[in-house]
Structures are given as structure tokens and as C-alpha cells.
Amino acid sequence: MSVSRFVVRHSLMSVWLVLLAACGSGSSAGGTGTPAPGGGTPPTTPEVPQPEPPAPTASIGSCEATGAARTAERLARMRPGTLGQFVVSFDGKAGVTPAQKALLQTLPVRGAYTLNRLPIAGIVATREAAQKLMATPGVRSLRFNDPVTLDDEAANVLTSVTRAQAQTALVNADGQPYTGKGISILVNDSGIDGTHRDLQFGGKLLQNALGHLNGLGDVVGINPNLPIENVPNTDVLGSHGSHVAGIAAGDGTASAGLFTGSAKGASLIGYGSGAALFVLDTLGGFDYAMQILDTHPEYNLRIVTNSFGNTGDVGTCFDPADPTNIATKALSDRGVIVVFSAGNSGSGPDTITGNFKKAPWVLAAANAEKSGLLAPSSSRGSLARGSYFTDVDGERLIVNDRPTVVTPGTNYISARAVAADPFTPLDTEADISSGAIPLELIPFYTQKTGTSMAAPHLAGLVALLLEANPALTWREIKPIFEKTATNMPGYEPWEVGAGMANVEAALAMALSLRRDYGVPNHTQRGFFASIALGESTVTPVSVAFAPAGAVEPVSFEVGADDSLVLAQWTQPEGNACTCAIVLTDPDGNRYGSSIALPVLGATVATSAPARAGIWQFSVSGIGSLSGVSLDPLGVTNGIAGPGTVDATLTVFKTGTTQGLADIRGRSDQTTIEFAVAKRLVDGLPAGFTPDALLTRRQLAEYLMAFGVRQTREPSQAKRYTDTTGFAAAVADAVTAPGQLLMDLSPEALPPLAPASNGKFNPAGTVSRQQAAFALVQAIGRQALTAQYEGMDLFAFDAEGNTVPVADAADVDPALRNHVQDAIALGILDVQLSQQGGATVARINPKGTVSRAAYAGLATRAYNSIPFPE
């Protein structure tokens, strides 16, 4: 062990001991209720007992599916007699019947593929035949066979797989950690390379089938779906499916266990359609899954993972008659869990790529970066319609228009298909330059990014739960993931669903070791204070993009009473501009969308918190591919064809507020409102009560917003004698080590410490130095604070010069590094004054924190988080 590492570890232990000592009473460490910096009135005594948060408000609306109407409109635009490719769904539960095949033969249908176990067929027919078929009794729906696109060791730590497999209470009957053993996952993708040692055909890979339905355009006559089985390598055109398979269940053989899937013990089944996918191809995968259930029950197929989407199907309502929904419902009815990627069309609302990803029985994964934050390209749900009812098979269900949870999907290291990846030269260059993969392993592994990678990780987590409790269905698994998920700082449910998946807690629920998870999660509780979005204005904008030369942005103004800015563009068919749209705020912060690809109806969007001033809307091309710059000299506007981007800008006003009447007119009103809007703080039943003292119970509650996992002891042992219910849940979470989303170290200290003698002291107050430590720790800066070891405390004057901290002696020595970091980041405010002709700073470290003051501290901590652009 090096000397420097010993110093850091010794310092961390000292921090823990001082926190224990500092929290032994109901007051702050040495604090006597001294006035807040600036000489204001001392805060009042806190209210006790602390109220439980309100129940979540149920706002269930309605949403009319438009799939049939959109199909009719597209048919009307076709020329008479023109052939098209369509997917027709019949009434019924089994495969296409002889009578239904006979119906197709009576129409001018040139050719068809019929599925074997689903009442669905792909047809090539004229416009007139399609229109007639839509109106025929017994036909549930007809849709175009549109193209779909693939939604391209930190990961297992982020979702607590590593912790779960080290938890002695979470083991199977043999005393081994859950790895998905005995569960099979079907990968419905481009294919799987079963010659890869992590995905060995005949071992890990039980069956590998090659689909052929992408040949619909050439088919003549009525033909059954006959995938070719026992193909060792079906991933011959893309490597996407092999990478996905490795994320779900790769066993790490080629890397001696370094790169494994989230369910490394699970088995795999492959269904490959090649790199070019259409709706019918993916339906063939679902049909094959139904076949496996009938012909190979010994495989125990329980999960189908899908990493594709339809960018022409964004912002739409869930459609029960959509053929994909018919297929996934049939699988769900037989106990199969269906997982989808949310899509890569973010960062604006209404960008989930397919109404079928919103099905009540489907789990949709958003994409997290390794920092624990949401990837900008990850598709988001709807602002306008959060939840609504739908009727399916005689049952009323609720649709949530948002991802289910978030799982890692950025720069994910997994299996590389041998000699199959068209981007191998670029991928290899990026893999070498990243340094994340040992050079000798680059022939076998590569990095890819997207919700394509997040979905199989979630599928693997599902396998862990099913091994633990095979009786679970989607009706139990989906709520378990939502109740146990980790809040993500500043994000709303329409963006991240319930937050980051937490499989350690999910396993405890699946095993019925704990049933009390959920209350700290923002989707499972209500709030006393809230700020709604108000009215919006929509403005069309147009930018002519050229690969080189000047591209003029559009300037527009945002007012002080605005709260959110959105931009959205739907790329017309034939537009060569493979571009991203970008919003730039008055401070120069950029908010970009993903790239619009040349497929039918590609839609991209981006959003940003409003800042008063002049904004710019601009367009850019592709800057890099697989991490390699395509324009290293910077002489272009990005790689893209010329084209006009006709987008819309939507600016929302700040709407009505609830529970904040007592902050009106205060100088810190805007700060408190920001903290409330981001769920960094909440009000109380009587109002926000800004001048009341912040309690330890309130601090524990509010720290959960910064990504503290709500993991608790599986044994249900009561940790503190003075907490129950909600207070116990948050106290358990914020005092447990290694539970920070933004610090993956298992040695990460908890933001708060217990009091003493098995007590949490929920009504105790909080000092400024304790709040500074908690916030710096929560945003994942423990390792960075070591840079201040042995230094005197300093602050900055108005010119940026360093000045000494006059009351540094009042800071607990073991907290100094965190306090210094809080000062340097601007989290902890300072008072500058003259002393002996020199400027000095004071921080009042032992002063108690009011609720209003904490809102300011939390807001500044939030603004210190390096959110990805």
C-alpha cells in the first residue's frame, strides 16, 4: 500500500468517526444556534414530529391510438395499383388459420409470409388490396412494414449487481449468488456469434436461428415463417446482436471473467434477422419465441430482449391493435417478460421510439452513462400525457408514457462478433484510444453506446429476479423495479421513469425478504410543494444546413417567467441532413439532440431549463463515429448532407405553485422554487416554512434526490430505535456506505452518520459543515476532496484571488477537505470582510441550517454536477 493511499483511507475513517461524534445530540456539531452568515434572524425551532409525505396524486387521462388513421392516410397518398409491404393482424390467439390464408389469396396479394403461432402475416399487396383488407371483418389491424433501427464492470456496480452477488442473504438454495442460472433470454436482434467464447453455441447459447422475413419484398405466394435453426453464427452483418447478448448473459470466458453480462449464469437463444430490420423481421422473433415455448419447454424461456425502435412512431399513444403489441401480449400471457430499449431520439419529450414500448406489460430501459446520469440521447416519455387507461383483452390497464427504469448503456464493453462489424476499423481505433479494454482483448470485445445496450442489461436483471422467484410475472416484476429504483438528480419521471434500477433491493422484494421499499422513490410518493408547467407558445424555425460554410442559427428570447424550452424536428423522407438540433442558452450551455437518420419519419428533440435572455437554435452534422472524429481539422459543420431543418420551438411558462405561499417576495424565492422544481427539497403541510431549522430527517429525505440507493438490510432488522416508516427508510439509506449513484466505490462513505446508541436523531439540527459534507459526498466527490489534504482553508474574493478562511479553526479537521471542496465549488457561501487591512472569509461552519438556506446549498450542489451534454 502506498503512503498516499494510506493517508486518504486514514482520512476517510477519521471523517466517519467525527461524523459519529458530531451527531450524538440533537444539535449541530458544536453549534449553538448562531446567526446565519450575514447577521439574519436565527432560524426558529423545527416542527416535530415530522410529517409523512403525502400519497402520490393519481392523474390518469386518456389517449386515442392513431395507428389506423395514420395508415389510412399513407395509403391514400399511394398511387393506384402501387405495391407496398404491410403487416396484417387477424383476430385470434394462435397462428394464421387456413381461412385467413384463403382470404389473402382472394385479394390481389402478390406474396405473403405467415407466422406460425401469432395471427400475423406480412404481405406484398396493392394499395387497393390493403384498403379492402383493413375493412374486412376478422382483420384486427393493418400497418406498413416500416423499417426499424437498432437502438445503439461499472454497469454492474451502477445497478448494484456486484453488491447483490456479495450479499450473503441473497443466495440460492446452493448458497450461491443469483446469476440468472436456469433462465433463458431470447435476443431478438441482428443475430448472435456463437463462435465467441463468451456466447458458445451448444453451451451458453442453447439455440441460434436465422430469420428470413426481410425477404418479404421478393416473396411470391403464401409462405410460412421457417427460420433456420442450429446456425453457430447468425450475426454476419452487424455485431449488434452479439454485443447485446454479451451484455445480457455473456459469461466472460474470453476475458477470464473481466467482462460479464448482468446475468452471467443465464442461457441464451438467438433469433437473427441481419443488420437491416423491418417490423415483420422483429415479429418473426416473437413468433419464434412462441415456438420455443411449445417445442423446448426445457429451455425455460422467460425473457425476450429487443433493442430496436421505429423513429416514425414517436409521440404516439399506445395502440392495442399494433402487431408488436399483439405479439408481446401473447408472450406476456405465457409468463415471458418483454424488455425494450426506450430509443436514442432524446433529449426532448415524446421521443420513445414506438408505441409498443409503452405497453403495460413491457419494461423499457433508458440509457445511463457511467457517471450515473442520463445520456442526452436517451429517449424520453411524454410531458402532456403521463398516464392513461387502455383496454386490452377485456382488462383495463394503465399506460405510463415513460421509460420504466434506467440502466447503463454508454460505452458498454461486451462481445465483438468476429469479422462481422462494418465499423470494426473505427471501433478498434476508439477501443484502443479509450484504454478501457486491454489490448489483447480487443479482438473479442468492443464498446457500444445506446439504449440498445441498456435493454439487455435490464433483461439480465430480470433473469436474476426470475431465478430467485420463478413465479413472478410482469405484474410483479415491473412494480418491483419501480419501487426499488434510485432517484436520479434533477430528472423527472417522464425522462427516467422511476430512476436507476437497483437489483439488490429488487431481489430482496422478489424473495419477500422486504416488502417496504418504495416510499423514498419520487414516483411512489407525493409532495407538499410543487411547481407545474404553465401555458406554452410554439414557434416554427427553419435552418438551412450545409456541410461547409456558414450555417446561420436562429436567435429567440426567453423570459424570466419561462421554465422550459423544447425543440423538435421530424426529418422528412428524402432529406439528406443527418443532423442534430442544438439549443444554446444565454450562458453558452449547449443542449443537443441525437442524430436524425435517413429513415421514414425520424424525429429528434432536445430540451433545456429556461434561462432569461437570448437563445440560439442551430443544426450540426455528425462529429464522430464510435468515438473517432470524422473531421479532426474542424473544417466542416459535421458530416451530413445538405438540407433544410424545419423545426418547432416550444417555450413553457412557469405554472401554478402549491405549498409555497410563504416564500413569496423573499430574496431567495427563485432559489427555493428551483430546488422544489428539481425535487431537491419539499414543503411541509403548513407551507415551506423557510426560516425553520432543517432537521436530520428532512436532510435524509432530500439527499435521496441526489441518487442515494434505498437499499436496506434484507433481514428487516430495525436499524434505529427512533425512526419508523418513511423516516426509517431514508435514514437507513443515507447512513449506509457504498450507496451513492455518483460514486461507485464500495468504500464511499454515507452522506450522514448515525447519532449514537442505535439512534438516528431525526429531529436533530444540521450544521453548515455537516450539510456541506453531505452534499459534496452525495454528488460523488469523495476521491476529489483528497487534493486538499494538508492545505489551509481558502476562499475567493470578487476578483478570483484566494483569501484565508478566518474561522477555519471551527471546522472539524476530518471534514475540512469536504468543506474546502464545497467552498471551491460555490456550494458553501462565504462572507468576505476586512481584517487588519486584508480580506478574509468566514463560513460559520457550526451555524445551524434553515430550510431556505439548505435550498440554496442544494441548488448550488446540483449546479455543480457535470451533467453530460
Walk through the language-model features, giving the residues of each:
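N-terminal domain-start motif of subtilase-like serine proteases
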Residues: 56-83, 110-113, 124-131, 150-187, ...
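N-terminal propeptides
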Residues: 520, 648-869
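C-terminal subdomain of the subtilisin-like protease fold in secreted/lumenal serine endopeptidases
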Residues: 62-65, 73-77, 301-305, 437-448, ...
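Substrate-binding/access-modulating region of protease and related hydrolase catalytic domains
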Residues: 95-99, 251-255, 273-361, 371, ...
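Subtilisin-like serine protease catalytic core
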Residues: 170-281, 297-302, 333-335, 357-362, ...
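Extracellular S/T/G-rich loop segment that most often corresponds to the catalytic His/Ser-adjacent loop
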Residues: 189, 210-219, 357-459
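Autoinhibitory propeptides
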Residues: 98-175, 181, 200-201, 360, ...
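Primarily auto-inhibitory N-terminal propeptides
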Residues: 37-121, 127-134, 140-143, 148
